[in-house]
């Protein structure tokens, strides 16, 4: 995401994806 808020959301989404795959 280009916006800072979007970047934070993308990071959180990636973290949740990793947790869900464990």
Swiss-Prot record:
Presence of the UniProt keyword Ion transport in the record: yes
This protein's GO CC annotations: extracellular region; membrane; nematocyst; other organism cell membrane
Signal peptide: none
Location(s) in or outside the cell: Secreted; Nematocyst; Target cell membrane
Chief place where the protein resides: secreted
GO molecular function, one term: toxin activity
Keyword tags: Cytolysis, Ion transport, Membrane, Nematocyst, Secreted, Target cell membrane, Target membrane, Toxin, Transmembrane, Transport
Stretch list, region Plays an important role in the hemolytic activity: 3-12
Quaternary structure and partners: Octamer or nonamer in membranes. Monomer in the soluble state.
Note from the entry: Hemolytic activity is 3.3 x 10(4) HU/mg.
Domain notes for this protein: Composed of a long N-terminal alpha-helix and a core region rich in beta-sheet structures. Before the pore formation, the alpha-helix binds the lipid membrane, partitions into the lipid-water interface and stabilizes the monomeric molecule on the membrane. Finally, it traverses the bilayer, thus forming the transmembrane pore.
Family: Belongs to the actinoporin family. Sea anemone subfamily.
Function of the molecule: Pore-forming protein that forms cations-selective hydrophilic pores of around 1 nm and causes cytolysis. Pore formation is a multi-step process that involves specific recognition of membrane sphingomyelin (but neither cholesterol nor phosphatidylcholine) using aromatic rich region and adjacent phosphocholine (POC) binding site, firm binding to the membrane (mainly driven by hydrophobic interactions) accompanied by the transfer of the N-terminal region to the lipid-water interface and finally pore formation after oligomerization of monomers.
UniProt name for this protein: Magnificalysin II
Organism of this sequence: Heteractis magnifica
């Amino acid at each position: 995401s280009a916006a800072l808020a979007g970047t934070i959301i993308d990071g959180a989404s990636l973290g949740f994806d990793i947790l869900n795959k464990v």
